[in-house]
C-alpha cells in the first residue's frame, strides 16, 4: 500500500513538472512578432523561409534570428575586408577600412549579446543588439560620405532587418 501511494505521488509530481514546463514553452506568435518589426514583409518572408521557426517558442526564435544576425554580420565583414584588399582607389580603400572597423564593432557587440540571450535577459539582448546595429549603419553613412558605391554594403540592409526582428523578440522575452 505504501509503495502504491509513493508511486502515485511520484507520478503526480512528474506530471506536474512536465505540464509546468510545457506551459513555459509556448509557441511564439510569428504574426505578432512580424507585425511589430520595422520591415514587416522582410520578417514574414524570413520566418516563412526558415522551417525551424514554425512551432518554435520565443527563446528558440530568438536563438534562430540571433544566429542569422551573427552570420549576416560575419558575411558583411568578410565581403568588406576583401574589398579593402582589392581596392586601388585610396578614397575607396579608406571607406572600406572604416567599414571593417564598424563591422568588427558590430560583431563584438553581438558576441556580448550572446550572454544576455543565453540567460533570457531580453533587455540586455536588446541593448547589445541595438549597439551592434550601429556599426553597419555607420558604414553605410561612411560610404555615402566618401561617395563610394553603397551597393558594396548591400548586406547591411538584411543585417538591420534581422536585428530588428531580434529586437522585437527581445521586447517580448
Swiss-Prot record:
Signal peptide boundaries: 1-25
Classification via InterPro entries: Invertase/methylesterase_inhib, PCW_Enzyme_Inhibitor, Pectinesterase_inhib_dom, PMEI_plant
GO biological process: pollen tube growth
UniProt keywords, alphabetically: Apoplast, Disulfide bond, Glycoprotein, Secreted, Signal
GO terms of molecular function: pectinesterase inhibitor activity
Glycosylation-annotated residues: 39, 63
Other known facts: The polarized accumulation at the pollen tube apex depends at least in part on local endocytosis at the flanks of the tip.
Protein name in UniProt: Pectinesterase inhibitor 2
Lineage: Eukaryota, Viridiplantae, Streptophyta, Embryophyta, Tracheophyta
Encoding gene (name): PMEI2
